[in-house]
Design a protein with these regions (language model features):
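Charge-rich, low-complexity intrinsically disordered and helical linker regions
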Residues: 49-87
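Alpha-helical transmembrane segments of secretory-pathway, organelle, and plasma-membrane proteins
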Residues: 1-46, 79-484
Length: 484
């Protein structure tokens, strides 16, 4: 422990646990196979023939009809209005292992679990022994989770750009990306007295510290980049996030809409589901200064001598609220996934209202495709939650916040620069370590706590905003357009 440091020990332990325990226990597999999820089985050809009253074609008859579609004895047509009963069975590990994107789903969920444990253990340790002049390795784990989650969600979005039948989905992604880009540009011109973006303070701190660092290196510069350029690239990132969040939001909205129909009689559960669905909007309001911060930290109510909260307590409450909402939505995931699996039954019931005929293959594919894309739907559900959750973790650590709401003074390391003087092999390792430490100190001096609070705070707020707004658009679509 003394040689490697507590953070490295925690990381090595978690890597070892991840490697040894991964083959025996998987949270991703448990969520799909041990939470009571039920899938529907498609009817076999013999069952469909029996229901439709179609006699089985013998080989002799099929050979006598040259050019007939029944030569293989597989494809036949049945009435769409046919009452087809569906058998159900519980989802098992052997069923999900062959699903599309299952390996990506298992990796993202399990890695996020172990990264969460690393963050929790690091926070507990640093609560007793505060970190000094060290890199918090839990931030590396959080960044890896965000990177993996974004990569998988991008790969899912790219699927809409492949094939000629995805023109509508492709257009939706492009339009959503440009719409969110426009919204981000409008948000960035809002005064920080109304919206706590923190970008102005972050830019001023970054510009000043970067100019000071360049000056210490003998380079004369007033700043690395203009405010307009930095905000433009940040707006591009916002548009990118909005584009890849649009279909996860639509999918979550469809599952929520189906759940509301299922609990149509139980008003209490409908109310709780609606509160859970609207909870990201409440998180978005926590960054609107006149609505929340000024009301809770500045206003003194009658009969009181001080505001309800201090600024530090409000920041801690905001972080806790994001984490609670994210964990709550993860807790509800099996209910939403069951609502998705019930789509197979709903498709058959809706088909009974249609006229005409359908082939047995089309009916079987319509039912089987629901379960086939289960992991895709699960990824679309959990990745926006993981983005908000781990952005909150990074915001807490790099922003210098505390869980108790008590502000801790942050001391930036002084800018140091020294050139190596020794050249023998015995001091090479020490020189490399010293240069690495100086490089980290320089980065800390440039990317100050104000920069981290501004950038990560805005990233957290925008992820939450994109998460809710895409789901809200999905609810509008399901309510007024899909069933109009």
């Amino acid at each position: 422990m003394a040689l490697l440091g507590a953070q490295m020990v925690i990381t090595l332990i978690m890597v070892s646990v991840f490697q040894k325990l991964g083959s025996f226990f998987s949270l991703a597999r448990w969520l799909l196979c041990s939470t009571g999820l039920v899938r529907y089985l498609y009817p076999t050809d013999s069952e469909l023939r029996q229901l439709a009253g179609i006699p089985k074609v013998t080989k002799e008859k099929s050979k006598g009809k040259k050019g007939s579609k029944l030569e293989n004895g597989d494809v036949f047509r049945i009435p769409r209005s046919l009452d087809v009963p569906l058998e159900s069975t519980k989802v098992s590990p052997l069923d999900v292992v062959h699903l599309r994107f299952y390996s990506e789903y298992q990796w993202v969920v399990d890695f996020a679990l172990y990264a969460g444990f690393v963050f929790l253990m690091s926070e507990v340790y640093h609560g007793f022994y505060p970190i000094k002049d060290e890199v918090n390795l839990s931030t590396v784990w959080c960044m890896l989770v965000l990177g993996f989650a974004t990569k998988v969600l991008v790969s899912l979005t790219v699927q809409y750009f492949k094939g000629e039948q995805s023109v509508g989905e492709r257009s939706t992604v492009i339009v959503a990306a440009f719409a969110y880009l426009l919204i981000a540009m409008m948000v960035m011109v809002v005064d920080e007295r109304n919206l706590e973006s923190g970008l102005e303070t972050a830019y001023q701190s970054f510009n000043t510290s970067a100019a000071r660092f360049l000056g210490s290196q003998g380079l004369q510069s007033s700043g690395p980049a203009s405010k307009l350029v930095l905000k433009f690239f940040l707006a591009l990132w916002c548009g990118f996030i909005g584009g890849i969040f649009i279909f996860p939001g639509f999918r979550a909205a469809r599952m929520h809409y189906d759940l509301l129909k299922y609990y149509e009689v139980n008003r209490i559960k409908r109310f709780l589901l609606n509160v859970s669905f609207a909870s990201p909007f409440l998180l978005v309001l926590l960054w609107v200064k006149p609505v929340c911060r000024d009301y809770l930290t500045a206003r003194i109510f009658s009969g009181m001598t001080a505001p309800l909260m201090t600024d530090g307590a409000f920041d801690s409450m905001r972080l806790v609220a994001v984490i609670v909402v994210a964990l709550h939505r993860l807790f509800l995931m099996p209910i939403y996934l069951q609502a998705y699996l019930n789509m197979a039954y709903q498709r058959v019931q809706e088909q009974r209202k249609e006229a005409g005929r359908i082939t047995n293959r089309e009916l079987q594919e319509k039912i089987a495709s629901v379960f086939f894309y289960l992991c895709v739907v699960t990824l679309q559900y959990v990745i926006p939650i993981f983005c908000c959750l781990f952005f909150a973790f990074l915001f807490k650590v790099l922003g210098g916040f505390t869980w108790s709401g008590v502000s801790v003074p942050f001391e930036s390391p002084a800018l140091l620069y020294s050139s190596p003087t020794a050249t023998d092999d015995a001091t090479t390792i020490m020189q490399s370590a010293r240069q690495f430490t100086l490089a980290l100190d320089s980065l800390k001096q440039v990317f100050t706590i104000e920069v981290s609070r501004g950038v990560l705070g805005f990233a957290l707020w925008w992820s939450t905003f994109a998460w809710f707004s895409s789901s809200f658009l999905g609810i509008l679509y399901q309510t007024y357009f899909q069933h109009s």
